[in-house]
Amino acid sequence: MRAAILFCLVASSMAVPSGSLGSRPGTCPPQPSDQVMIEATRCSYVYGLTWDWNCNSQGQENYKCCQYENDIRICVPPIPADVDEEVGVEQPSQSVDQVRQAIQKTQDFIRKVGLYPAPDQRRRTTPTPDTVRWCVSSRCQMTKCQRMVSEFTYSPNMVPRKQWKCTQATSQEQCMFWIEQGWADIMTTREGQVYSANTTFNLKPIAYETTINDQQPEIQILKHYQNVTFALKSSRLVNPNTFSELRDKTTCHAGIDMPDFDMPASFADPVCNLIKEGVIPVTGNYIESFSDFVQESCVPGVLNMTYNKNGTYPLSLVTLCEDQQYKYSGIKGALSCLESGKGQVTFVDQKVIKKIMSDPNVRDNFQVVCRDESRPLDEEIFTDVTCHVGHTARPTIFINKNNTQQKETDIKTLVVKMMELYGNTDRDVNFNIFDSSVYDCGKCQMTGKPLNKNLIFLEESNTMKIVDDSKVYAGEVYAAYNVCSKLVPKPRAKICVTNVTEYEACRRFKGIAENIPEVKKVAWGCVLANSSIECMQAVHNNTADLFKANPMETFIAGKEFLLDPLMSVHRNDSVTMNHTYTRTLAVIKRSSLAKFPGLLSVPEGQPKYIKDLWKLKICSAGLKNFSAFHSPIGYLLANGTIPRIGSVFESVNRYFQATCVPEIEPETWRLDSDLLLGREMNWGFSSLNMYNFTGQEWLLWNTPATWNFLTYNRKVSTGLDIKKLIELKKQNLTSHIFNQNLSSPRNVELLDDLVGVEGISDLVKGVQDTIGPEGKQKMNMLRDRLSNSFPNFEAVRTLSDKVDIVNKMKDARQQRLQNKDHPFGNVIQETFQGHLMVDVFSKLLELRSDKISTLEEIISHVKTIPYLTDFKDVEITTVLKHPAIMSYVEIYFPRLSQTFVEPFDNVELREREFNRYTNPLWLSPKVHTYLDLVKNHQTEITKTCNSNLPLNFKGYEGALRCLKSGVADLASSTSRPSVTRTLRDTDLSTGWVHLQRPPPSLPQRQVVEIDVNMDIAKVCNFGEVMNPVLVTAYNTSGSWRWNITKALMIAHQSVALPALFGEGTVMGKDYDMLLPIAPLNQSYQPFLGSKPLRSMEAIVKASSYDWFKDQTGICYGETYTNIVKQRNETCQAIVKDVTCVGTPRMKKISVGRFGAKQFKMIKMCSRPSKFVRKMADFQCDNGFGYLKPVITAVACECMLCEEMIEYNTSFTEDNMWSDVSNKYVLTGEQDIYRQIPIWGNNSYFYDHTLNKNFELGNHSIIVEHVQTVVVERPSPGILSQVNSEVDPEVQVQMDSASLTKTCETVWNGQSWLPERFQGYKTSGSCVVPETGANAKSRVDRFRQIMQRKQQLVDHHH
């Protein structure tokens, strides 16, 4: 979609064959000779685009406006469209370069129009040879301009005669942009604006102001410069004497943004010049480099948000005048700062120097610092360039450099005339361009000074000079500013905090860090937000860089805001010295084991397993700690032990006999107070995500909760900004786009490569210029269908715009029904006011098929849904990545879909991950119904807690108290030392745990004794709970991450440590160290670990009422994240696959193809039934990456638990086979069957020990893997097949009489994808293997069976 928009803009900015308005037939010829270029007529451009009708001189009626090197546009005769390519049509490489340049210019145009809006359409007149439009940027300037243009227009001496007009912008930069685009013609600039006008906006200087009189003659080497800056010091000081000795000195400056003062001469000009000459080393941008060069300064205003946008500039820039910036601002303030001894040097211009020299009483008190020595104040310093620290360009007049040569010459002539007629007149009698005193503009509220100063022109100026095009204008200024403009700021690290105490601590850390050599290589800053969600959003939006997040915040930050962990914040009571804080455990009373009689018969020392967890009552420590509720409950939800039906609370309440989760009473606890549980309702933001609509409306209203809270708006670096494109549409700047021929073959061929969107050309290939009667009828039918299916309204909405959203939808639908007679494209344009995207699709709608129109409708509606408009309007790729849209695009635009998906993506996995996407309409509750159900289950869950009010069950110790009191059987806990001490003193056993290498009996849980040192917790746990981490945006570079990590590690061992850790600090009192995280784990999925990750993914899944989940005999799958590791686990990829769950019954099946059928009870398990091979993106620990296909499961069914089940057919059991005399006896060499295989004579029918394919006499089903297959007579090509992944010592026998339902391990893919689980050995079915003395190998068991059979045969004989 973004590419379609970009293509249209690019197509309109090129000279392509077209018969539309603004473009003449033919193509641009190759660049002509230099002489032709000089003599040719220049042509202007409008809206940043070239227009042929600018070539309107006599004889140029068919000329085209063509652009060549150095951005020069001239009128040239075109090459006819029907001329063969060999005659001179541009070669493909030239076309590629031209389109690429057009793309860059279009992006620059869109960026600027967002910063500097275009004038309204009434004032957006096109450039003509007879009109000159002067642009000003204030009301006072406009007053003077109106009088000025009146004089110019009606004066008979202002020849050549022109019509002069004024146009007012809001800033000088906006004026520059308007002139660049042809919406204005001329303006004056001063100081730093002179550089911006020429470099940023491509304007051309034609004249400059100056002051020449007897007292101030023009100095040739300084004629282009308004001011020359000098470094002034007190003559009492020995140092500094040279520029290099300015290092580590204190400096005073007039300021950086104060009005009515010559600021560039005081700061920017000298600093940039000293950087250019190598005096000031480059350590960041020019302000940062200067602050590192000097010791302390007084630069009034430098920390204001106008300049200090990131809030990271060092406080040392205002240390000398922190509380008195206004007092020391301006030239007088800077001199006062110097004279008072606060600073050792200040920077002033030549006018100040001359004023000091004119006073003999103070002249000897100062000296100027030059490159090699300090000098007294004398006239020689003005011509001695070694004493010039900086230069300020004179006020300069700029015009569009793409004006025609004639218009440029006319304007220069008129500037000379303007000076002659109005430059030296009596200001009291006649109009004078340099006089501003006659205009009443009020006074400045800050200073009380009148505002009618230096309007348009400087009052001190008295003449104007035309710039000589053959010479460099203001070269010293451009040289210095070019250096500064290319400087890269220090890596920024703004820490986001959520309370005032942490914010003040962050400010203290910033002040300390700016004085530590290695740490100050980073620009530190602080951001105060209202909540952790706002901090995540700030980091995502690049207004902050770091945020300390606990494990649940880390998960939400990564999943919703694309943030990555950078460093872990080590807690001082962590169980390890790495990133692990604690481990999630569960404990059960020994007396509760009596509920499971089967455990009593297990011999001492043998493992005990609990299968039916639903028989238990549980106690939780509450929702404040991840290990207390989210980790264990989430993991049981993820592996299917607890069926997810409705909300998490409802699922838990349905499953266990009783539950105590303290402090979740519905009267006091809200869903949005918990980051994981609150995602269900978008953290309290109003939403209609569960409202009962019908059909497509239901789908669209249910999708917000199935997608990210924020967007991937920074995912595609080359994407165009939709908001700015909308601005173009609003200002009618895009009408020319649809006058281009979208089906131009050359442009279509370039689309995929140049725009970077493979498949976008599919949208425009084969587009027809007309629609036949059938097509029109089809469009009318489509229009009627969509008008009844879609409620349309304005696409751009804000958070406050959702209260009456349903009513607006109904009203919009009625409007659609009333507009049936309108063309479909017009209806869309009327409905979606302001959307350029709709314009593009309307054009395509008229030319292509209903597939595009359907996609356009879906996209438009998704963009109107809450939380898809508030934050996701920035890039259209966001909408394309929406699951509902992706599923449609994958069918109809498969190539286009591959552009906007991650390397690993699958429709089926996506549907299971966003399960409301497939939830039936009749099972989708309304919001209030859902909330009522949640509250009912909250009430029931807290009954167990509230019925024992005298006992406090809050926290981990409260949960253990709950167990001891007999209220519950089992509780969640943690391996933290303070909790484990309580465990050792309590009559409890650890249980409900997950082994490090799971036995094949999960979701049973092994019960083990609590050892003295709690070492069992290292392997028996629900997963490790990680320490909090500093998260940052996903698209920060590797160098940035290392610079920040290194700086924080150095700060940890410096005087900054007390500001980082302790009471009232940035990290807090419970933490003591920052640990770097390896790049391979700098994503939230691998850092959190598989068990906690799946636990949280299960908690945040959208609620669905899938009735089948708690029914036996049903198998289904849930999508979760998995980590694929390769190359000795040094490379990993993050993928999605399916976890198979369910409780299938035993299945009775008949086996055998011939002979009597046998009926066998077969154990069924939920297993993957469908696999796909998708590309995965592997990242390695050394920064290397590669793409490689991996196989993953996408669907589940009830299947055999084992890959192979062996059985013996009925006819092999006949007694006949016990007598070898039953063989067919050959009658001699002449027997006709001698050369024919006789199956009844095969020896293994009579002696089964001769072939391992038979295991007779075993009436149970043997479930095992066959390691070796042996044939009696090996044939060529048949080899022994060995499976090295199988453990030959594992043997399992299933008793069909006692086993009624599955208890197998969750299918994670260990067997079917060995490369993902290296070192894993398949372990058979779900029943506990025989161990110890009773364990028998398969060979031993087989021999025993055969011995019994042989005994029967001998007895028969």
Swiss-Prot record:
Glycosylation site list: 198, 227, 304, 310, 402, 499, 530, 541, 572, 578, 625, 639, 692, 732, 741, 1035, 1043, 1081, 1128, 1208, 1241, 1258
GO BP field: iron ion transport; protein targeting to ER
Cited InterPro entries: Transferrin-like_dom, Transferrin_Fe_BS
Matches recorded under PROSITE patterns: TRANSFERRIN_LIKE_2 (PS00206), TRANSFERRIN_LIKE_4 (PS51408)
Gene3D superfamilies membership: Periplasmic binding protein-like II
Tissue and organ distribution: Synthesized in the intestines of the females and males and also in ovaries and testis.
Domain Transferrin-like: 132-478, 493-1101
Subcellular location: Secreted
Signal peptide interval: 1-15
Highest taxon of source: Eukaryota
Keywords: Glycoprotein, Ion transport, Iron, Iron transport, Metal-binding, Repeat, Secreted, Signal, Storage protein, Transport
Pfam families: Transferrin (PF00405)
Single GO term (MF): metal ion binding
Keyword Coiled coil: no
Any single Gene Ontology cellular-component annotation: signal recognition particle receptor complex
Function: May serve the following two functions: a classical role as a yolk protein precursor and probably shuttle iron to developing germ cells.
Family: Belongs to the transferrin family.
Protein name: Major yolk protein
